Amino acid sequence: VITSNSRNENGEVVFGMNDAAGVFPAWPGTMGIAAAVKGNGPGLVDTFAECIRREWDAVGLKKGYMYMADAMTDPRWQRTYGTFGEDPALITEMISRLVPGIQGSESGVTPEGVAVTIKHFPGGGARENGFDPHYEQGQWNVYQTEGSLGDYHLPAFKAAVEKKASSIMPYYAKPAAEKS
């Protein structure tokens, strides 16, 4: 199985990284897609998902590490660009449409579909001081507001499970209710 991170939001060819596959048609980044959906309605997500599925299937990419279901609750986090923003209802709508659209069916992955990995469970956008969890000072996801984990961060992951996403990627940070 050939896998990749999403390719439709990055038209830059990087030698040794994505040059062999060529450039895929460019769409706006994930925040741009979310903004367009907010302004034009969710049908755009269906078109986006169908384009991804067809393009990836045509070149033999059958597994995508995409998309981030993280609610951006700390704007200092350097990965905010990969989120659909901070609105849990919009993020949930995006994931609910992307998963079956890319995989090819409401029932899971079809032969023409591309298996998706939704990331970063249980919600990587709650970064302590915006620090990156690849380093010791960024090891915590802090859900300080009572109920924020369930209200803001988990709904899109629940939708991913309901829509039969092929997998969910856990985050490499530790969940906490208080700052370290």
How would you describe each model-predicted region?
Residues V1-S180:
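Glycoside hydrolase catalytic-domain context in secreted enzymes
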